Amino acid sequence: VKLFHVADVHLGRRRLEGRLPDSDLADAFGYVADKAIEERAEVFLIAGDLFDRPMVEPPHLRQAQRILGRLKASGIRVIAIEGNHDRAFIHSEEPTWMQFLAEDDLLVLLRTAFDASGAILTPWEPARLAGAWMDYGGLRFVGAGYLGAATPFKVRQLVSQLESDKTHVLLLHAGPDYFVGEGGGFSSSDLKAINAKTCYLALGHIHLPMRYGDWACNPGSLENCDVSEARYNRDLAGAPLPRGYAVLEIEPAQRQKPVDLQIRSNPRRPVYRLTLDCSPFGNKIKDGAIALVKAAVDIIRAAEASPDSVIDLRLTGRLNLNRIALDPTSAAIEIQEQAEVFAVTVDLGGLDVASSLTGGELAARGLSREELEKAAIREVVSAKHLWGIDDREEDFSAFCYELKESVRKEKSGAELAEQIGSSPLLELIACSGSAIAKNGTPLQGPSEEAG
């Protein structure tokens, strides 16, 4: 049986304050669907977060209907679970748009309920369009979905009830415990328990590609849901890292693992992560900002960025706020226009900011305190010598500031957990602390630079 596996499509995701088109996400999804049709796949798995929000807007619903309709017309069975973005609350009984698609006969939605005695594994019934599992092509597909903080406990309950004489494919929207906070991740011992009863574990939730041996896989997000995810295109050694979707073949009689498993990359909008040292411009009384913009345009042109590219520009060096006041939003727009690229985002987290201005003077000049706050965080981080992020204090300081801003904006716990879990800094800390799977092949993660 040939299967395609995607996760974290996030149709409707708003990126760079709406400057990037949401059609990027649909195009990536459509590309993989067309590949599945071309290669005559029999099953198409969606391991959660087809949509970015529980409240789906009509254009994004139409995107899903159109692409899923192509799969249906080609006779490919789509089997899906819901992720944390697909429904408002884990235990909510409110109808979801994933249910709507199931009622429209565009996918089979699997859900497992739990009570005090454990998992309730009911077969999927066409009359109810509901159930925890279904048999198809000699395989038994089981949908665990997103289980939140109780993931380890509930997954063990579920797999303990799986029949040993069946070849199981388990769909789970979760990641390893060193990436997922709030106790919602699985450990290497959890994976061993799952592997004892499962031929293939189809994962989602963490947006970078991960693989455990030859039987468990998270293919990563199809498109960059955040520009920073472009760093996931390379591994820790700097080698290209396939990311986007998984293709596998399972022989039902061979229950231990798939016959073949590959993670493949799909086309996505190019992102260039570039660094510019601002020190030469930081003390210029006149034309400092103009010189900085020109230098940024020069390095973008040197990178031969195409017109459809996004530039993730990181500024470093020392910048004297008494001499040059830089508005990152205005600078990004000006750089974008002069470099003739699709979008530019300017990250000030790596700047060493010098200023003798007081808070009142900063306010009077219309300057944000962001640069000064990051500098203060950086000073504390440098003094602490945090294990695993040596020489990355600036990145860690920027991450702490962004997390503080997310809390200030009252983002949900799930959104904060995703923000923390998607940071490549956690991968560095995890590697330094040997926080990798102790049994089998280590889970492979991202590099710090994009390809």
Can you name each region flagged by the protein language model?
Residues 1-67, 73, 441, 445:
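N-terminal active-site segment of His-dependent metallophosphoesterases
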Residues 30, 158-159, 223, 393-397:
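A structural signal for the main folded, soluble domain(s) of proteins
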Residues 251-254:
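Short loop/turn segments immediately following beta-strands, especially the blade-tip
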